[in-house]
């Protein structure tokens, strides 16, 4: 499981589309608030690893490519803890 406090320090790239609270800033950006950390983690890894195509993959893949497994777990923990 990730560390939500550490995740808050790692969301710099995420906030442009998902905001600090995980609420998508435009309709095409999904809300991350309260999503399962497991789901978020697997989704971000799939984008990073090029396994997820279509939709927002063109945006998400480059954003996720620099993230380690630990970074992803921490970010997922952070957004899943938001209300």
From Swiss-Prot:
Key words, A-Z: Electron transport, Heme, Iron, Metal-binding, Transport
Gene3D superfamilies linked to this entry: Cytochrome c-like domain
Xref: PROSITE patterns: CYTC
One Gene Ontology MF term: iron ion binding
UniProt KW Calcium keyword: no
UniProt binding sites for heme c: 14, 17-18, 63
SUPFAM superfamilies attached to this UniProt entry: Cytochrome c
Post-translational events: Binds 1 heme c group covalently per subunit.
Pfam families to which the protein is assigned, alphabetical: Cytochrom_C
Assembly description: Homodimer.
PANTHER family assigned to the protein according to its UniProt record, in alphabetical order: CBB3-TYPE CYTOCHROME C OXIDASE SUBUNIT FIXP, CYTOCHROME C4
Protein's name according to its UniProt entry: Cytochrome c-554(548)
Species in which this protein is naturally found: Halomonas halodenitrificans (strain ATCC 12084 / NCIMB 8669)
